[in-house]
Amino acid sequence: CHTGCSACCHQVFAIQLSEFLYACYGYQRLHGNIENILNVGSSVYSRLVTEYPELSQAIQKIEFATDAASYQKSSGQLAECMGRIKIPCIFLNSSTNLCMVYDYRPIVCRYYGLAYLPISDDIDKFYICKENVQGVTLSDLVNLDILGDNLIELSLFKSKKYNAVMFDMLFPIFYFCYLFTSGKDNFNFKFEKMKKLSRAKYADSMFERNLKK
C-alpha cells in the first residue's frame, strides 16, 4: 500500500491471538509501554458492544461453540457484524496516518487491499485495490495458503477440556484488548511467553520466510 493510505485500517478484522500478541510485542519494542493502547482498545470494545449487542453475542457463541458447524455459523455472524463497523485500528497513528506496528502487523493487514489471483479452474479474475493500481506482476504476489498454514500451525494448542488439538479462534483486536485489561485467561502469561517466542518462531517462520515486504 502507499504510505499514508489507511483506507483498510478503518475496518474491524478478526485475527488470532498469536497475531495480536506479535503486534503488541512489536509496539513495545518500538514505542514502549503498551498499557495505554490496550486500555483504549478495551474502552472501544465496551462502546461497540453497547452500540452493536450482536457483536458480543457472536463472540460468546464462538467461544462456546462445540462443533465446526456452530463455530462457522457464529463466525459468519461475527463477520457480518464487523463489516458494518467503521472505526480506526488502535495501532493506526491518527497524526501521521501510519501503522505503528507495520513490521509486526497481522496477516490480514498484509494482503487486504493488495492484488491477488484466485487459483481455480473456473475463475479467471485478477483482483486489485483501486487505491494501489501502479502495475503488479505475478512476482509481487504471495502464497496466502502458505501463510495461512503457518498461522494455523503456530496457533495450535492442546485442549484439556476437549482432549484434542485445537487452534486459537479469530476475534477482533478490540476484544483481545478487553481480555488483557480485564485479566481474563491469564493473558499476561501468554504475552510474556509470546515475547520469548515471537522472533524465533513467529516472525522467522511466517513473515520473514514467506513475505519479505
Question: Where would I find each of the regions flagged by the language model?
Answer:
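Short loop/turn segments that flank or connect secondary-structure elements
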Residues: C1-K213
